[in-house]
């Protein structure tokens, strides 16, 4: 089976790739290396701000274009959450649709923060989470920027698009079992 893993979350896709390769599958991992983890990847999408500055996003797109032969024609593609490429939300939506139409199945991994998760936590679901425990909201001031980022209209729309149009959702964190 030909598999593409897009994005990274604490070496989750890297570990998954190792297991799938041992089972005989052909796996390509495309990510930015998950920031400071700098995890191994086949297609490097890291933004080099020092070298390219504000043009670094174009370099990410160029790397994607140069690797279309690896990105298209997969049996399964799993994307890491809704922002799986280090670009703005609308670029992630465009790339999502391209991946969806050029591959057989696309799976969204629920591996990190997203607007839905924060909305549920604000309601107290589940009873314990990063931002809610002991019956009340916690760490709101510390998480204000993090939450504001995910509630930006472009990212909220991107989350809806990727979540509702994926063929399946895979939950990793206990918060997703709501």
Feature names for model-found ranges:
Residues 65-72, 93-102, 129-168:
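Membrane-proximal helix-turn-helix segments that form the acceptor-binding/catalytic region
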Residues 2-6, 68-89, 105-108:
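Short N-terminal targeting/anchoring amphipathic segment
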Residues 12-14, 36-39, 85-88, 114-119, ...:
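Short catalytic/ligand-binding loop motif for oxyanion handling, primarily in non-cytosolic enzymes
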């Amino acid at each position: 089976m030909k598999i593409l893993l897009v994005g990274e979350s604490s070496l989750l896709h890297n570990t998954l790739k190792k297991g799938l390769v041992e089972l005989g599958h052909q796996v390509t991992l495309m990510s930015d290396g998950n920031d400071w983890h700098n995890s191994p990847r086949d297609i490097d999408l890291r933004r080099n701000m020092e070298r390219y500055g504000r043009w670094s996003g174009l370099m990410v797109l160029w790397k994607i274009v140069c690797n279309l032969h690896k990105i298209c024609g997969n049996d399964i593609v799993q994307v890491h959450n809704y922002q799986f490429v280090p670009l703005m939300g609308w670029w992630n939506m465009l790339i999502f649709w391209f991946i969806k139409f050029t591959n057989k199945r696309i799976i969204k991994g629920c591996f990190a923060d997203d607007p839905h998760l924060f909305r549920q936590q604000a309601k107290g679901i589940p009873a314990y989470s990063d931002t809610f425990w002991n019956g009340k909201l916690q760490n709101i001031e510390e998480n204000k920027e993090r939450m504001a980022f995910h509630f930006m209209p472009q990212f909220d729309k991107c989350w809806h698009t990727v979540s509702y149009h994926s063929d399946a959702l895979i939950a990793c964190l206990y918060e997703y079992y709501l």
